[in-house]
């Protein structure tokens, strides 16, 4: 079974304190985890962006204090979450840059899951997705990018040069009918994930393999 969870959490009606609730659950059942809140403006604009960043920072600092106290098992870690580039304006990316710098954590973001994400970035910012994130110092060896189906060759080169990670989510891509990532062999640091569609990684491996053979 699963012993570890990497989580990209969203609860727009419950932002502040939500990651602590998750941590309590992980500690209760004894699972290792790394979690974050997916910063976005898609429900409540700039206020939601600010609250999401604040929750990520608060939780990272809570983890730092918990590690020093050693009164609880060290099972849960933090990273800095963002939903997707098309729901995080430059003001939000600047907040995330400061959060990454302040906490020493990496960014966890879904990018290029659909072609729209890329088109939006080109239309509004005139940049490829990861090039835009890199402008805010958000692509490094601690960065986790989910999906990446429509990353450009330049973005893939950037991802590899910065030693960042890409997570392939075969069943989620099939379920959302977004296509297939044909550049997996070009990725240096590649991992397999589920995007929350299940917890059976052996099943995920089977789908990833057979879809690749399709």
Could you tell me what each predicted segment is?
Residues 3-4:
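Short acidic/polar active-site loop segments enriched in Thr and Asp
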Residues 7, 82, 141, 163-170:
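Short, basic, glycine/proline-bearing loop/turn elements
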Residues 8-15, 81-85, 174:
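Conserved short loop/turn motifs at secondary-structure junctions
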Residues 17-149:
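Metal-coordinating catalytic core of metallo-dependent amide/deamination hydrolases
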Residues 39, 113, 170-175, 194-198:
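Short, acidic/turn-prone active-site loops that include or flank metal/cofactor-
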Residues 135-138, 142, 182-214:
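His/Asp/Glu-enriched, well-ordered alpha-helical/loop segment
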Residues 150-188, 192-193:
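A conserved active-site cap/scaffold subdomain adjacent to cofactor or substrate pockets
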């Amino acid at each position: 079974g699963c012993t570890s969870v990497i989580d990209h959490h969203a609860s727009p009606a419950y932002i502040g304190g939500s990651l602590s609730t998750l941590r309590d659950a992980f500690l209760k059942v004894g699972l290792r985890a790394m979690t974050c809140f997916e910063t976005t403006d898609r429900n409540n604009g700039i206020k939601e962006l600010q609250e999401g960043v604040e929750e990520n920072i608060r939780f990272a600092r809570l983890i730092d204090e918990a590690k020093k106290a050693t009164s609880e098992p060290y099972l849960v870690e933090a990273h800095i979450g963002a939903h997707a580039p098309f729901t995080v304006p430059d003001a939000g990316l600047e907040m995330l840059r400061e959060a990454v710098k302040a906490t020493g954590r990496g960014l966890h973001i879904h990018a290029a899951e659909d072609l729209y994400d890329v088109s939006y970035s080109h239309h509004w910012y005139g940049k490829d997705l990861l090039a835009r994130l890199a402008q805010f110092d958000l692509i490094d060896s601690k960065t986790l990018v989910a999906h990446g189906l429509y990353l450009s060759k330049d973005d893939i080169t950037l991802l590899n040069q910065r030693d960042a990670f890409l997570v392939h989510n075969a069943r989620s891509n099939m379920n959302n009918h977004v296509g297939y990532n044909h550049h997996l062999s070009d990725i240096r640091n590649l991992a397999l994930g589920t995007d929350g569609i299940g917890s059976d990684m052996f099943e995920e491996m089977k789908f990833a393999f057979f879809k690749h053979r399709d």
